[in-house]
Amino acid sequence: MGAAALKPEGQTERPATSATPDVDVAIVGAGLSGIGMAAHMQMMCPGSSYVILERREQIGGTWDLFRYPGIRSDSDMHTLGFIFEPWKHEKSIADGPAILEYLNRIADERGIRPHIRFGTKVLSADWDSARALWTVKTEDEAGTRRSVTARLLYLGSGYYDYDTPHDAQFAGREDFRGTIIHPQFWPSHLDYAGKRVVVIGSGATAVTIVPSMTHKAAHVTMLQRTPTWYAIRPARDALANALRRILPEKVAYAITRFKNVRLQNLVFKRARSQPEKVKDYLTKKIKAALGDKYDAKTFTPPYDPWDQRLCLVPDADMFEAIKAGKADIVTDHIDRFDATGIQLKSGRHLDADVIITATGLRLTMGGKIALSLDGVPMNFADHFYYKGCMFSNVPNLVAVFGYLNASWTLRADLISDYACRLLNTMKAKGAHVATPVLAADHGLVEDNVFDFSSGYLQRALTIMPKSAAALPWRLNQDYVYDKAWMKASPIEDGILALGRAQPAAQAQPQLEAAE
């Protein structure tokens, strides 16, 4: 199994009429999703070829991009880790470097690294019906453009816009004499020792940064518009570490993973069915952690738990910093920045030397790649999800969008397994094309693709694929159900049409009729 070299733009190794691609699968992204797909291919499709196209110079994706203080997982590594590779560290809530080490070790031990083309940004991908393949065009840092053809395009590029975060605009920003930083572009040599820091935001990024910066900063203030629900849990999983001492690594990992998956699922469903009970539980934990520092106004959100993702606070580290007087949380609205800090609408002023704008991320679908079908631009928002990874009337395209109520990698594992079974079925049947077919008069009841109120998700609704009320045409948010259903659901389910290459003149009327 090998990976093709990328060809200079305009150069082809085969005639333009050939239906033989350079590789079976072009994987976009060398983060969790991409490395996971490569590993699954080597286990399940050893006769198939692939290439990983990665715009950065390192493995890791999100975990290589974000470098702010304390960067860590917001899920336990027994579920954020892959199903096939045990997590061996003592801490189950892992920091960024440990996650990078995990990914790099997998890439090296499994021989994945030689298949990665680093410094390669994917610009576009066009599906050619006549040849039944994708032509993927790329550009390196020197501006050299190349292309590669693939039977299947696998988008493991995550959902963050790496170039443009959601950076809220504040009046008077240019007046501030200190340093303003967005966490997505953290400077490597920032010196904040002895300085007053204000972190704007109360999401996972802010909750991570605040306690981490208190070790050097004079004081750190989290400035929030509205409170967030926090979940306190130990950074180390006592059961996992006990099992590792008495059982084989893979067995201990599987037991812990099963336990954590079921617990995640139970908590989410309980939050939706009995929100008051979950509120009481979370509040009691926060009160116990803060003691007399607890303030109901600061820690009582105007929404139910899991209407937005819970923010994890490992070992109650942020609350320990607040108790120690090294950090505090202010609930207010910003009027404007000034020379020495932030003027709030309440009239209060926050003095600051450094302001961190942890105001959110901008979501993107498919890594902002210009996708087209026989030269006609494709818009994800015009298509329904199929089995949470393919799209109505779009051939040979698989994309990963992880769970919102559980670890990202849980869905990535399911999708990699499905994609490999799809590849094997296509090869066994002599098929070149796999298309989830949806008739124009489908009658599907459309549902909200995100059943969450988080701002970063709501801002992205216009670019997201559609999600129906019923399977298989939806992005489901229940891993336990999905795992059983995806395994039991056959590839040839009466919806996914398998076929061979056909001229575009024949393919286009079929697509138009389906749409």
Each language-model region and where it sits:
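Core beta-strand elements of the Rossmann-like FAD/NAD(P) dinucleotide-binding domain
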Residues: 23, 142-152, 193, 345-354
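Short FAD-binding loop at a beta-strand-to-alpha-helix junction that anchors the flavin cofactor
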Residues: 80-82, 180, 388-405
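Feature captures the FAD/FMN-dependent oxidoreductase FAD-binding
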Residues: 90-161, 289, 336
